[in-house]
Amino acid sequence: KKFINYFSRNNYVKVLSPSSKNIDKKESKLSYQGFKSSNFLQKIIYILISLFKWKPMQLGYFYSPKIKKYVLNNLDSYDLVFLQSLRVAQYLPENINKKTILDMGDITSKNYYQTSKRLFFLNPLKIIYLLEGFLVEKYENFCFMNFSKILLFSKKEIDSIKSNFKK
């Protein structure tokens, strides 16, 4: 929220997010549009589609065709695109010619690998966490290569990423 308030001081800012219902409101230079989230069955289908495409399950869980359509139809209206998590990076088309910033927070794949290591080897969740860790790491690398800037919280994590990703 701090980034949004900072950006909206001198720029027009449009915030898109999943919501319990469709919402559209505006306050001076800041406007908000909420898109109703997919239902449970749709989420399961989107998760399976993500797995079929070798992308993280969480991308499928949080996928919204309405947000995707809005972004594709309105992208040319903005000078800068700021995305606040790995999960929403999926809405940005590849090879975009705009300044893009992704606030990842932390390197999520490491969390999945750590959780997988702590689970008993016969626990089926171990395989799910390991698979999601691999898919998230692959997607993180894609984001590092395709975004103008990536924001991370921890200096330790910044230092741990490959030098060819540092911008």
Regions found by a protein language model. Give the residues of each.
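N-terminal subdomain of nucleotide-sugar transferases
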Residues: 1-33, 76
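Helix-loop-beta element that forms the nucleotide-linked donor phosphate-binding surface
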Residues: 93-98, 142-153, 158-167
